[in-house]
Amino acid sequence: MKVILDKRHRSGAQRGKETWDDFLKIYSDTLWQCDFVSKPMWAVNGLVDLCFVVILLPGTRRCWISPCTLSTDSAWFGQQARNVVMEAEDLNLDPQYVIRNNDTQFTAQCDVAIESSGAKIKRNTPLSPNLRAHVERFIQSLKQECLDKIGIVAERHSNHGSWERWGHYNRERPHEARSHRPPGWNTPPQANETVRLNDVIYSSRLGGLLKHYERSAA
């Protein structure tokens, strides 16, 4: 054993000094991150929790948000899994792995629904906060910039707020990790030497809660 350690022999896969960031760069186009989100809703008998699923692809930072529900049963989750797989196919994306935490809402039937699409489930190991850092950061900003500022009174109300933020994030909001392009953009914007104030177009969502500025088309 001492000889093996002295010679630094390695068994199995070759190990190096790669970090988790290096690993994500290798598998960023096939490793999806998944998490449940809850949002209180005012009902006749008081506050109840609505739940929905957020799935994010680290390679492009593109995300997907499911409709909300009061009951996250296997039938509901199975439908959401099929929906996101269909959308991924339309965008020529290949979710080979879905990494999730050990939340009890992820039942065996949920895993079966995901695996039926051809993807494999990877569960969080204990005390590993960085394994799904991208999706958790998105959920944090979703709550801080949108959901925490809205009093939800119906499921359609919750869906509208979440999906407006989803559209803003995927198609409008610049992302530093993508050279300040939104996750849904595949090509950079046309470069201009100067931009006049009259060329800037302002738009908003949710009554001005989400703001967006862009250059008008030439």
Regions inferred by a protein language model and the residue ranges of each:
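Charged DNA-binding/catalytic regions of mobile-element recombinases
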Residues: 1-218
